[in-house]
Amino acid sequence: MSALAGLVDKGLMAPDWAQALAPVDEQIAAMGRFLREELAAGRTYQPTGEWVFRAFQRPLADVRVLIVGQDPYPNPEHPIGLSFAVRGDVWPLPPSLVNIYTELRDDLGLMPPRHGDLTAWADQGVMLLNRSLTVRPGASNSHRGKGWEPITACAIEALVRRGGPLVAILWGSDARNLRPMLGQIPVVESPHPSPLSAYRGFFGSRPFSRANRLLVEQGGRAVDWALPME
């Protein structure tokens, strides 16, 4: 059984994503070996198990907005396989997510919740994709360049081939470097929401209302960015 077929069989990846990622099936298998070797060497990784490919559990056909992150939070037990999101019981929230919530309030007047679980966005077709899908706890960027990038690039290329209605939200230089890959897909871009750069143009960039406007212009439905309070 191929790596992708195994993921679909376990309910960890939508079938249309498995079809789109067929060109990197061997690379996905190689990443599985890499992660097993990490564990054998006493080096854990996160997120684990069913959350590694969580961004691919909703169908490719349903994706309306792509938000690209760098890699999962390195804080132990924080990441849930969706970029910028954390487990619902994590407190305090990561500073980048606090700034995202501040911009959400300023942009759309929506009161942010106390939790950092962004599953409600994913359920509406917002793909929260990290360029690297795993990280060693406590070591940011530790799995960068280990082999995830060709896989996530293939995913982005699949979205571009599928076409709109689709909007890409690119925060920070790493994400913005992907713009040439996106072709004619409308893009909303700004500095990263990190405290190091949020005041250099993330605050006031209104990404949520701008993305909705671009979706509607393509004949799509606007995203309801409100998150459940609990």
UniProtKB/Swiss-Prot annotation:
Its EC number is 3.2.2.27. Keywords: Cytoplasm, DNA damage, DNA repair, Hydrolase. The active site is at 71 (proton acceptor). SUPFAM superfamilies: Uracil-DNA glycosylase-like (SSF52141). CDD domains: UDG-F1-like. One of its GO terms (biological process) is base-excision repair, AP site formation via deaminated base removal. It is found in: Cytoplasm. GO terms for molecular function: uracil DNA N-glycosylase activity. One of its GO terms (cellular component) is cytoplasm. Its main location: cytoplasm. It holds the Pfam family UDG. It catalyses: Hydrolyzes single-stranded DNA or mismatched double-stranded DNA and polynucleotides, releasing free uracil. PANTHER family: URACIL-DNA GLYCOSYLASE (PTHR11264:SF0). Belongs to the uracil-DNA glycosylase (UDG) superfamily. UNG family. Excises uracil residues from the DNA which can arise as a result of misincorporation of dUMP residues by DNA polymerase or due to deamination of cytosine. This is Uracil-DNA glycosylase. It comes from Nocardioides sp. (strain ATCC BAA-499 / JS614). The lineage of its organism: Bacteria, Bacillati, Actinomycetota, Actinomycetes, Propionibacteriales. The gene is ung.
